[in-house]
């Protein structure tokens, strides 16, 4: 799958979020990268051979105290997603899952809380 098609799936996943979340999503950059770098994987404690599909970097809305902040950043990693998916339908579903997961972090949900919801 080419980058343009993959980025289109990321945009579609964002547009398909429920309106109550879209309306509160602010000051967030959503980017696509091919693969996470080794420094990122090591920093997150991901061992060799482990995969990272997405990454939220920023201050969750629940922890903000005011003032101007740099935009949060959500990175979706195309390489790992394409590696585990067998067809475009699976890629679309995985991208949607990862986008929802990372946006949940933006709204202050922990990894444990997100996993309890099935994402």
In which residue ranges do the predicted regions lie?
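Active-site rim/adjacent substrate-binding subdomains
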Residues: 1-94, 106, 110-118
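Catalytic glutamate of the conserved HExxH
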Residues: 98, 102, 106
């Amino acid at each position: 799958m080419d980058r343009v098609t993959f980025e289109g799936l990321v945009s579609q996943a964002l547009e398909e979020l429920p309106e109550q979340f879209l309306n509160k999503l602010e000051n967030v950059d959503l980017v696509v990268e091919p693969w996470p770098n080794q420094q990122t994987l090591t920093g997150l404690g991901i061992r060799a051979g482990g995969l990272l599909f997405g990454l939220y970097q920023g201050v969750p809305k629940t922890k903000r105290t005011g003032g101007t902040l740099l935009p949060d950043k959500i990175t979706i990693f195309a390489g790992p997603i394409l590696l585990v998916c067998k067809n475009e339908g699976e890629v679309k579903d995985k991208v949607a899952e990862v986008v929802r997961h990372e946006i949940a972090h933006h709204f202050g949900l922990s990894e444990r809380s997100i996993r309890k919801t099935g994402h």
